Amino acid sequence: MNQVWNIARKELSDGLRNRWLLAISLLFAVLAVGIAWLGAAASGQLGFTSIPATIASLASLATFLMPLIALLLAYDAIVGEDEGGTLMLLLTYPLGRGQILLGKFVGHGLILALAVLIGFGCAALAIALLVEGVELGMLFWAFGRFMISSTLLGWVFLAFAYVLSGKVNEKSSAAGLALGVWFLFVLVFDLVLLALLVLSEGKFNPELLPWLLLLNPTDIYRLINLSGFEGSGSAMGVLSLGADLPVPAAVLWLCLLAWIGVSLLLAYAIFRRRLT
């Protein structure tokens, strides 16, 4: 485990030196506070509205940002080391490829987790201090669940980045594929489901369609953050299908964890077969 931690510490140190942690934390804090106070501006309201509305807006924002940030953070984790000649050096040490991959995942995962905690935690603290009459128990429960699920979503896409980075031979190829993965899961997947609904006039296997949401970690993430507020009415579009999904919230959490585990195993299998 010392070898794993040494690699993780190196990745964390690189993130601090490159200002990744500071930049992500600041971005999350500014956007979260802005959404909390200006999220209802389109309807003519300024100021904090409600915890469910704030969490729903933040979850929608994080659905776009977390995957992109995670992919940009780790797309060159393997191919970048290979191009720079440091991967060959690493493999001369008594280190297994699994240890290298796990160390990178721990280091990058800590960067994302700390950024989420600092950025969104500051927003929760600002609401607690500045909004009169807010229910603190519900506020910290909702933000705690939101921050944990956001971190897990980021970890899913870190694992995706390792899969891509282990598969290609050039950083530019990894960057292009990373953007393609982001488009697929964040934009294209839901559009395809909506197209199925529209073209079939709502008749496309209504029992199967809600289960298809589990094939997209971003949809699982949004369902987790919308499911805890009964009657909030925040689920729109494809996510409204989640109301027909006969599974408890715990299963959604397990599905998100499964995405991380399966993706890391796939990344390891690809990395193990990679020739340096």
UniProtKB/Swiss-Prot annotation:
| Source superkingdom | Bacteria
Question: Topologically, how does it sit relative to the membrane?
Answer: Multi-pass membrane protein
The reply on keyword Membrane is: yes
Q: What Gene Ontology terms describe where this protein resides (cellular component)?
A: plasma membrane
Record-annotated membrane-spanning stretches: 20-40, 55-75, 111-131, 146-166, 179-199, 251-271
GO MF entries = ABC-type transporter activity
UniProt entry tagged with the keyword Membrane: yes
Identify the InterPro entries for this entry: ABC2_NosY/YtrC-like
Q: What induces it?
A: Induced in response to denitrifying conditions. Activation requires NosR and DnrD regulators.
What are the UniProt keywords, alphabetically?
A: Cell inner membrane, Cell membrane, Membrane, Transmembrane, Transmembrane helix, Transport
Where in the cell is the protein located? Cell inner membrane
Report any Pfam family annotated for this entry. ABC2_membrane_2
- Say what the protein does: Required for the assembly of the copper chromophores of nitrous oxide reductase. Could be part of the ABC transporter complex NosDFY.
- How the protein assembles, per its UniProt entry? The complex may be composed of an ATP-binding protein (NosF), a transmembrane protein (NosY) and a solute-binding protein (NosD).
Name of the molecule in the record: Probable ABC transporter permease protein NosY
Question: Organism, per UniProt?
Answer: Stutzerimonas stutzeri
- What is the name of the gene encoding this protein? nosY
